[in-house]
Amino acid sequence: MKLCDFESDYEIPNNWVWCNLGLLFNHNTGKALNSANSEGKALTYITTSNVYWNRFELNDLKSMPFTDSEIEKCTIKKGDLLVCEGGDIGRAAIWNFDNEIRIQNHLHRLRAYDYIQTAFYYYVLYAFKLSGKISGNGIGLQGLSSNALHNIIVPVPPIEEQKNIVMSIEKLMLSIDNIESHKNILAICIENTKAKILELAIRGKLVPQDPNDEPASVLLERIRAEKEELIKQGKIKRDKKESVIFKGDDNSYYQDLPSNWINIRLSAISEIITKGTTPRGGKIAYRQSGIGFLRAENIAGYDKLDLSNLNYVDEESHKNYLKRSILKENDILITIAGTLGRTAIVPQHALPLNSNQAVAIVRLVNNKLINVKYLAYTLNSPIIKSDLLAKSVDMAIPNLSLDNIAECNISLPPLAEQKRIVEAIEKIFATLDDIANQVE
């Protein structure tokens, strides 16, 4: 890049000058490992894969032979600036360790001459990278050669000003890190608060009870009657296990609930609990358009679907081979492979949809007798999630069985109270989300 290009892009103070980077640093590259130069003593070295912006990853270092002359040329010392030739072109870090080490040929070593603040030029390279002056839009090379690096035009302030600039940048960086740390702490606090709200909700302690509400036991009998009719019609099979549970397996999960609540298995209120299907041919079956095909990554949590990265299958597959997993409005979806237990509710506007085998589908007997949002929030409560995770199968990809889902213990309040609980949860969650958004 020519000097005039930089002069047109940047204005510098009168007591600064422009200069080639190579005039400010002693510049070397490392050693290439090949059969022609295999003599010398085996020593550890680093490559571009060890160098990140302002940091190093030094696990599993490799060794190769270095002769005495190669050691002198390829060794880095504390304070040297390393710059990547390829990969993320121009990525740089300062070696701030007391021990010395060797470098491979795709790394540039810049050792500053007197009156040069190395950290200042690290930040210059970082600024050039962010603005496109290195790679793509600027130097425009597939690799940053020694000649290209040498010829990069950089500003040269007085040495004391270089030091002051570095101090100011690092002070700002520290402030930013502190802000990010506090944001992370706040995010954790918000998630913990949400978890506590859900815990209170499923224990009947979030909203007051109304003695005039129809008890959940009566509600359950109405659901059972509808389910029995579906069984008689041959549309569904009878549950394998009794549906009412008054205590958890450890005799403590489900105690002290309000008198008009009841404990049930999820299967007691479900018409079907199944999972999606892998299309024939796997990913080859995906289309550019057609029927939306959900994967675990589309299940965003609570009641939300993320349709931003949706795959598609053709309508014939949807109606035939994949007919078991045709989704309906208000189906509750649960991830059962990979990241376990995320939930979503299928909205009418997103249909038609299908899903793959990493997603469980829970379809209620009657959506008018159970508030699907209450059920989704219940499945996200710490008690339920920990119970499900405890039952997961520890494989290369953790997974939950449909039996795990069906046997999930649900604290069921009266229908009217379900609605009040959902309203309270969403009001509190909206406030917490507003707080989180204000610090973004």
Where are these regions (language model features)?
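Non-catalytic DNA-recognition/assembly elements of restriction-modification systems
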Residues: 2-31, 163, 182, 186, ...
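Sequence-specific dsDNA recognition surfaces
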Residues: 6, 22-35, 49-78, 247-252, ...
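Specificity-determining recognition surfaces
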Residues: 125-154, 283, 378-410
